[in-house]
């Protein structure tokens, strides 16, 4: 759901309430997190301000509004939804009218495939008598390849997207970006791309829907024990105390954060689930009122110090900070490069009101103009949440539309020589919706493009000339941000907190239970979705606001999405330079990173 700060400002002005730009951005973030429209959010906010007797909008008022109104409404909604779900199956079975309507929809869909179109817009069909030859496909331009009439007879270009005036605007900058030409060498440079896996990367599909609850518990327990062992050694802790053993002196406990109910985690519902070795998986409620600074989310592995005088409740007084992994050390051959330009973009590649791929075609033009050494393209390429996909208005199979996208990008960027890396998304409607997600398969990849095109899994560890990239298309910031609770004595940046959690939990998806959109296979998750090292560059696309930040020496970028609702979005670009001699403060061979986020 795209949120407009301009519309928020207009709604506020109706009530005579002015707002600073920073607060508008915060309000837009709340709209996304709590899935509220601009009008609904402003109405709730005005009602809150009126009842509280506030005449101006401040950061403190927004924080109180989120805590007292939005959080409570979300908890109530989750509680009522859980009650409704108990009886949903029975209603589905006994509702004959719904079955009749479903059959009518299927017949309508079948007629859309079987009834030939009439008039000048008749589509070319491929039959055994008149096959569509490869030559006729390869000679078409990118615009012809992605002609929307080939898979949606009612497709029209987005008016808001085509009328945008801020294309090419740089919206945020990181590092010494001044003087950088932002143009690469395309295929003329020496580029080394290696997918790193420990012990090996995910390269093919696997059987799903076979996991049992004990298998999930085993993975979570192993994660607690592994992280606990690392933190125990780092902080020189002699031993952990079992959760349920009463003690009069301070104790140190190891466990995983959980919630005592089915609702959202809050300061009164925190529980600690112990490890198997010391606590046999027991649970204990946690009182966090004595902690001045904390940030917690379900699934987080923590070490807590406090008092457990009864063996039934822990009063926490100290929370040990997590420790990130060391950085990747490149070989002499990998580290021998001068500079590399990397472009990163994340789907959707269509606007919400149109199935035309104009934003993708504009991105191809940018690639051909700037000639980056490597282009990393994240899904979704055909978004499962697109209105025309949800309403079954496309007349071509999803797989065919996706292949047209791939063919357009590969052939359209051939002249630039740029290396292409494709990362799938759980929102790719044609692909396997399981996490970790295997790479795309494209058997029709031309031989001349095989050296410069690479399909990787979601998530993925990719070494580009010895610079380790962490890649994921999952919206970690949104998922963890919606579940996190925090208390801070000073100013605290939510994005930085979440990124620190990911790096110190050493996992691409440390949240448990996962978000409702996630179908996780935990056996493969334990093998393929862990961070083997702290990446030099971490790409975390999100619906939330774009940024580039330095977290523990790792450059973390949210390039935004290429489209935001009906308007254009943003993409990112990075300029990497490694000094031939010397090391930085993190013990790495000197690496300099400049980055920008740019509007399409």
From Swiss-Prot:
GO terms for molecular function: DNA binding; DNA-directed DNA polymerase activity. Keywords: DNA replication, Nucleus, Phosphoprotein. Residues 112-167 are annotated as: Disordered. GO terms for biological process: DNA replication; DNA replication initiation; DNA replication, synthesis of primer; protein import into nucleus. One of its GO terms (cellular component) is nucleus. Pfam families: DNA_pol_E_B (PF04042), DPOA2_OB (PF22062), Pol_alpha_B_N (PF08418). Residues 125-140 have a biased composition (Polar residues). Gene3D superfamilies: 3.60.21.60, DNA polymerase alpha-primase, subunit B, N-terminal domain. Phosphorylated in a cell cycle-dependent manner, in G2/M phase. Residues 141-158 have a biased composition (Low complexity). It is found in: Nucleus. Coiled coil: none annotated. The modification Phosphothreonine is found at residues 127, 130. The modification Phosphoserine is found at residues 126, 141, 147, 152, 154. InterPro entries: DNA_pol_a/d/e_bsu (IPR007185), DNA_pol_alpha_B_N_sf (IPR043034), DNA_pol_alpha_bsu (IPR016722), DPOA2_OB (IPR054300), Pol_alpha_B_N (IPR013627). Its main location: nucleus. Component of the alpha DNA polymerase complex (also known as the alpha DNA polymerase-primase complex) consisting of four subunits: the catalytic subunit POLA1, the regulatory subunit POLA2, and the primase complex subunits PRIM1 and PRIM2 respectively. Within the complex, POLA1 directly interacts with PRIM2. Belongs to the DNA polymerase alpha subunit B family. Accessory subunit of the DNA polymerase alpha complex (also known as the alpha DNA polymerase-primase complex) which plays an essential role in the initiation of DNA synthesis. During the S phase of the cell cycle, the DNA polymerase alpha complex (composed of a catalytic subunit POLA1, an accessory subunit POLA2 and two primase subunits, the catalytic subunit PRIM1 and the regulatory subunit PRIM2) is recruited to DNA at the replicative forks via direct interactions with MCM10 and WDHD1. This is DNA polymerase alpha subunit B. The gene is Pola2.
